[in-house]
Amino acid sequence: MTPVRPPHTPDPLNLRGPLDGPRWRRAEPAQSRRPGRSRPGGAPLRYHRTGVGMSRTGHGSRPVPPATTVGLALLAAAITLWLGLVAQFGQMITGGSADGSADSTGRVPDRLAVVRVETGESLYDVAVRVAPNAPTRQVADRIRELNGLQTPALAVGQTLIAPVG
């Protein structure tokens, strides 16, 4: 049994409780405020319906004939082959360039000229402007090489030696 404290002794640790009445109760098994068990003790619950409606007609399973399986596999192979050919010929049409700006030769022009950088242009913009039918990345690399540029940053009005064509 736990001792009972006097009713008017202040408790500095718990100021939210009532000031009148006992602070300690006897150690008795406290009754739970939880509701009682709602399930039977020994047997699992049985669900009578799942809530999913199903038609009352017979649902016999028919095996898929091997001809259907082979036919679908051949159809999938034909579609895969067709997509591969489209990708291959599409790459041949664009010349294999990532940006699609390459001509049939895919070469950087040999002729050089002095060009001036315009407002808002990057190195790649200049490359597209001076050699629109050549691979942009290769033209930009050639401009960088000809002018000794370490970065692709350009200043407005800067003059560059560039391949044109």
From Swiss-Prot:
Keywords, ordered alphabetically: Cell membrane, Cell wall biogenesis/degradation, Hydrolase, Membrane, Transmembrane, Transmembrane helix
Origin: domain of life: Bacteria
Biased composition (Low complexity): 29-44
Induction info: Up-regulated in the presence of nitric oxide, reactive oxygen intermediates, mitomycin C, cephalexin or during growth in macrophages. Expression is strongly DNA damage inducible independently of RecA. Down-regulated under hypoxic growth conditions.
Transmembrane stretches, start-end: 70-90
Major localisation: membrane
EC number: 3.4.-.-
The keyword Plastid is assigned to this record: no
One Pfam family linked to the record: LysM
Region (Disordered): 1-64
One GO cellular component term noted in the UniProt record for this chain: plasma membrane
Subcellular location: Cell membrane
Keyword Ribosomal protein: no
Function text: Cell wall hydrolase that modulates cell division process. Probably acts by modulating FtsZ ring assembly. Murein hydrolase activity is targeted to sites of nascent peptidoglycan (PG) synthesis. Overproduction compromises midcell localization of FtsZ rings, but has no effect on the intracellular levels of FtsZ.
Oligomer status and interactors: Interacts with the cell division proteins FtsI and FtsQ.
Protein name per its UniProtKB record: Cell wall hydrolase ChiZ
Annotated organism of origin: Mycobacterium tuberculosis (strain ATCC 25618 / H37Rv)
